[in-house]
Curated annotation (Swiss-Prot):
HAMAP family: Ribosomal_bL33. This is Large ribosomal subunit protein bL33B. Keywords: Ribonucleoprotein, Ribosomal protein. One of its GO terms (biological process) is translation.
Length: 50
């Protein structure tokens, strides 16, 4: 199956900084990763949005 595009949004400011490819099969939980936010200028939690 093909991958769908999803983006990772910063929890602090809400900006969508990263885009990723995720499998099209549904998952019960969404991906959460600590990444650098260029607007907050710090490492923050980013959650998967569709």
């Amino acid at each position: 199956m093909a991958q769908k595009k999803a983006s990772l949004a910063c929890v602090e400011c809400g900006s969508r900084n990263y885009s990723i490819g995720v499998s099209s099969t549904p998952k019960p939980t969404r991906l959460e990763v600590n990444k650098f936010c260029k607007y907050c200028k710090t490492y923050t939690l980013h959650k998967e949005t569709r």
